[in-house]
């Protein structure tokens, strides 16, 4: 005899109910064992088997294993003083241990590349994570009159050998500054490579300049030399003298088209 729906429901209690759909398969963990792996465009997986890493404070979204986090703020007294004096800096945490660390920043796109005895200059708002083998510091990108008028512009320099992950608002473009004179809105520039020279231009024409056909951008960066500048399709917001993002695997050549 049919027990009826109530009896069948009681009998099925404790049984494992299957979940239908491809949710867990489509979003399964990337099994690559590389040090820095893009789980997807907006989530980075870091294997701690390769040693300690620096990650942006607050960027951890998950981890598996035994990982310890030490918030070192701006990275030591020297960097702290520079951060306070310039208004530019990035708060980082030192990550050690074993396992896999997943980091992200407000669902921004993530770009990964490898530095080999090289250096780059990065907008502090775009720094996400990098190998502990890489040295970093806060530096002034231009000391000219235009930069002084702009209130000073400061970046984070990364130098050495190891992996680097930066964030961008949307898919960026890598411009070869050696092919033609290159200019960009200072608030849209993510980074530039060694060998690139930069000068700051300030549009003092205001509304008249805009009416005459100007860009309407107060601060522009003019690039020369040899190398690449990475530009995102969105501007950062200048807050208190420093740049901050809006509300918030391959080598370097692979990222920049080299």
Language model regions located:
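N-terminal amphipathic/basic-hydrophobic helices that include classical n-h-c signal peptides
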Residues: 1-16
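Composition-driven recognition of glycine/serine/threonine/acidic- and proline-rich low-complexity segments
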Residues: 14-258
């Amino acid at each position: 005899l049919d027990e009826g729906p109530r009896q069948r429901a009681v009998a099925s209690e404790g049984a494992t109910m299957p979940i239908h759909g491809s949710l867990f398969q489509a979003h399964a963990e990337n099994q690559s064992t590389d040090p820095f792996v893009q789980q997807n465009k907006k989530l980075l997986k870091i294997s701690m088997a390769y040693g300690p890493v620096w990650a942006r404070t607050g960027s951890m979204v998950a981890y598996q294993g035994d990982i310890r986090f030490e918030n070192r703020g701006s990275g030591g007294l020297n960097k702290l003083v520079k951060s306070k004096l310039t208004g530019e800096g990035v708060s980082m945490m030192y990550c050690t241990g074993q396992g896999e660390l997943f980091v992200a920043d407000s669902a921004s796109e993530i770009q990964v590349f490898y530095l080999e005895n090289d250096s780059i200059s990065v907008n502090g708002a775009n720094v996400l994570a990098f190998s502990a083998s890489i040295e970093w510091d806060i530096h002034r990108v231009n000391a000219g009159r235009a930069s002084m008028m702009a209130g000073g512009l400061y970046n984070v320099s990364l130098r050495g050998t190891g992996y680097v992950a930066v964030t961008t608002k949307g898919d960026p473009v890598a411009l070869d500054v050696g092919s033609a004179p290159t200019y960009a809105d200072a608030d849209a520039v993510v980074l530039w490579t060694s060998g690139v020279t930069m000068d700051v231009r300030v549009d003092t024409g205001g509304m008249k300049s805009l009416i005459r056909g100007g860009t309407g951008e107060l601060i522009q960066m003019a690039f020369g030399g040899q190398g690449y500048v990475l530009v995102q399709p969105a501007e950062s917001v200048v807050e208190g003298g420093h740049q901050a993002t809006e509300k918030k695997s391959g080598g370097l050549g692979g990222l920049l088209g080299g």
